[in-house]
UniProtKB/Swiss-Prot annotation:
GO terms for molecular function: DNA binding; DNA ligase (NAD+) activity; metal ion binding. This is DNA ligase. Zn(2+) binds at C411, C414, C429, C435. Residues 598-681 form the BRCT domain. The gene is ligA.
Length: 681
């Protein structure tokens, strides 16, 4: 069972990540992750906070709208918050939204206003007695940036309202976008000028609107679409529905999306969604979904708001754009941790504003699940409009020459054996000490403080050593000299001497540190200590097979196989020999826990958990007796546990054993079980 501390740490990590991405998206207008990935983070946070409401904090992203604005522009406080909308990604979520509305209003059918969801920047316009006086970005929803001068340059924003205009203050809200044709024209001009082009219309609109020099904004073609109103005086026009607001804004010469409409009930919402998704590409501007709002303003008022969004509205997001193309080949990329990832090489295709030639296939299971073959016509989606992904095969178009994909059993980079451990989806290169693709990670880990501990060997220095081909494996570190190091960037003679001294000092280490430094997958510090304690000798450890390794306490089949695979790879053994020949050494431990070599063990391979206080034995004594008879003792109860040995005052482990139906022994029963074999010797 996951502890509450673990949940709290997960919540803190999610909040920190979302806050950082909010800053990139809302403030810098330079998102670093796809929208779909952000949505997944936010939904995960929402779900966890719903499960653990007592862990919700006031500063959680779910309790606010966005991120604080920059201090570059003057700040403008919104009289009424510019809230974001909750998102729906499926028809089921839309149906659930409609059901909540009907139940809250106690009516059978709801009249909805529906409109496109522009992919631009939300803007507030303030008119005083019919004259545009202020304009601001949404910012964090409560305070935005005053960009009045820039907004005044946009032709589709009226500087003066039509007579009769509302008296006092009147706020219009909408979205600034760049039309597709204007975006293409701007990028063409950028290319001619030798300047950086924009990735998509939204980025172009953001970059244009947030210029400190409004003359630059004036040269960019931006368009404003109105979709609502904010604060206004009581003596201003009285509206009863949202559609009436849009109609009024149109009379004031604001652009209002022609696709705005009204529908009845969930069926009407879904029909509108399908209609807009079908015409999405033909629209003059980018949209990433549609917006549903309860049309009746009195009903909106009754439904109210949550801290982040109105209850009466929701955004129904479109799936990422999808197109078909030919899969020309499947190549393997090797990551810095040794993961082998199949990558589709595609006939070039334009998806979501960019030309795509590669797409991730994730892993071998995904290729098989989707029945992907080389030569297939595949559907490519830009997941989150950023990461290209092969989502399906058009089997009807499969050519006769299509070839099945076979995951390689050797690393394409270094030739080492590639293995896939049980219960893992990823195939990995076992040449961790040798593989060029893993070189940087292997050297940094080897030299880290808890491993061999080479003081002064940081990431930037390792980059230089690798880039200049001075170091290929950790063993090469011990061949570096002062003159070579002094020739590197930011490495004077003194720094070089200090590093050579640190490298020399690192030769005297311990066996647990050395084992940990090798970077064997699943082998942390505790496991390295256990391996050293129970073998006492590196050669012995390197020659053990997976079955023998499992006789060591807390070494399960997956970890055992990972260790065996690592040491069976000749490249790794060669690097280890080089390290030893360079002078790395350690003292042998004074006590070595030897697994019994007897063949007639009482409990070979059985797993025990101890809980409570035993009458005549300490836990260590009980553990030693169990291990002498081929068993192993672990610290937690699971379905893999063979027996739980309970003394007086047993803890939660006892209750867990009862829950799982695992046999519970007292001390006498344990001794009897262990004597069954010893008495027959």
């Amino acid at each position: 069972m996951i502890s509450e501390n673990t949940i709290e740490e997960r919540l803190q990590a999610l909040r920190a990540a979302i806050a950082l991405h909010d800053f990139h998206y809302y403030v810098q207008d330079a998102p670093v992750i796809p929208d779909a990935e952000y949505d997944a983070l936010f939904r995960t946070l929402q779900q966890l906070e719903q499960q653990y409401p007592h862990l919700v904090t006031p500063d959680s992203p779910t309790q606010r709208v966005g991120a604080p604005p920059l201090k570059v522009f003057a700040q403008l406080t919104h009289q009424t918050p510019m809230l974001s909308l909750a998102n729906a990604f499926s028809e089921e979520e839309v149906t659930a939204f409609d059901r909540r509305i009907r139940e809250a209003l106690n009516i059978d059918r709801v009249d909805y206003a529906v409109e496109p969801k522009f992919d631009g920047l939300a803007i507030s316009l303030i008119y005083a007695n019919g004259i545009l006086t202020k304009g601001a970005t949404r910012g964090d929803g409560y305070t935005g940036e005053d960009i009045t001068l820039n907004l005044r340059t946009i032709p589709s924003i009226p500087l003066r309202l039509q007579v009769p205009f509302p008296t006092g203050q009147f706020e219009v809200r909408g979205e600034v976008v760049m039309l597709k044709t204007d975006f293409e024209r701007l990028n063409e001009q950028q290319r001619k000028n030798g300047e950086k082009t924009f990735v998509n219309p939204r980025n172009a609109a953001a970059g244009s609107l947030r210029q400190l020099d409004s003359r630059i904004t004036a040269m960019r073609r931006l368009t404003f679409f109105a979709y609502g109103i904010g604060a206004y005086h009581e003596d201003q026009p009285i509206f009863s529905t949202h559609s009436e607001i849009l109609a009024y804004l149109a009379t004031q010469q604001f652009l209002v999306a022609r696709q705005s409409s009204t529908v009845m009930g969930a069926n009407g919402l879904l029909a509108y969604y399908r209609e807009m998704n079908a015409v999405r590409l033909s629209l003059p501007y980018e949209i990433d979904g549609v917006v549903y709002k309860v049309n009746d303003l009195a009903q909106q008022e009754k439904l109210g708001y949550v801290s982040r969004a109105p209850r009466f509205a929701i955004a129904h997001k479109f799936p990422a754009q999808e197109v078909s193309t030919e899969l020309l080949a499947i190549e393997i990329q090797v990551g810095r941790t040794g993961a082998l990832t199949p990558v589709a090489r595609l006939a070039p295709v334009f998806v979501g504003g960019v030309t795509v030639t590669n797409a991730t296939l994730h892993n071998e299971d995904e290729v098989q699940r989707k029945q992907i073959m080389i030569g297939d016509t595949v559907i490519v989606r830009r997941a989150g409009d950023v990461i290209p992904e092969v989502v399906a095969v058009i089997v009807e178009r499969r050519p006769t020459h299509a070839q099945a994909f076979v995951m390689p059993d050797h690393c394409p980079v270094c030739g080492s054996k590639a293995v896939r451990l049980p219960d893992e989806a990823v195939t990995r290169c076992t040449g961790g000490l040798y593989c060029p693709a893993q070189r940087k990670q292997a050297i940094l880990h080897f030299a880290s403080r808890r491993a061999i501990d080479i003081d002064g060997l940081g990431e930037k220095l390792v980059d230089q050593l690798i880039d200049r081909e001075l170091v290929h494996t950790p063993a090469d570190l011990y061949r570096l000299d002062i003159d070579t190091l002094a020739g590197l960037e930011r490495m004077a003679g003194k720094s070089a001497r200090n590093l050579v001294t640190a490298i020399e000092d690192s030769k005297k280490t311990t066996l647990p540190r050395f084992i940990y430094a090798l970077g064997i997958r699943h082998v942390g510090e505790a496991t390295a200590k256990a391996l050293a304690s129970h073998t006492g000798d590196l050669d012995r450890l390197m020659d053990m097979n997976a079955e023998q390794l499992q006789q060591i306490p807390d070494i399960g089949p997956i970890v055992a196989q990972s260790i065996a695979d690592f040491f069976s790879e000749a490249h790794n053994r060669e690097v280890i020999e080089q390290l030893l020949s360079c002078g790395l050494q350690w003292e042998k431990p004074s006590h070595i826990a030897q697994p019994s070599s007897r063949t007639n063990l009482a409990v070979p391979g059985k797993t025990f958990v101890l809980t409570g206080t035993l009458p005549t034995m300490t836990r260590d004594q009980a553990k030693n007796r169990i291990e002498q008879q081929g068993g192993k003792v672990t610290g937690s109860v699971s379905s893999a546990t063979s027996y739980v040995v309970a003394g007086s005052d047993p803890g939660s482990k006892y209750a867990r054993a009862i829950e799982l139906g695992i046999p519970v022994l007292d001390e006498d029963q344990l001794l009897s079980l262990l004597r069954d074999t010893s008495s027959s010797e």
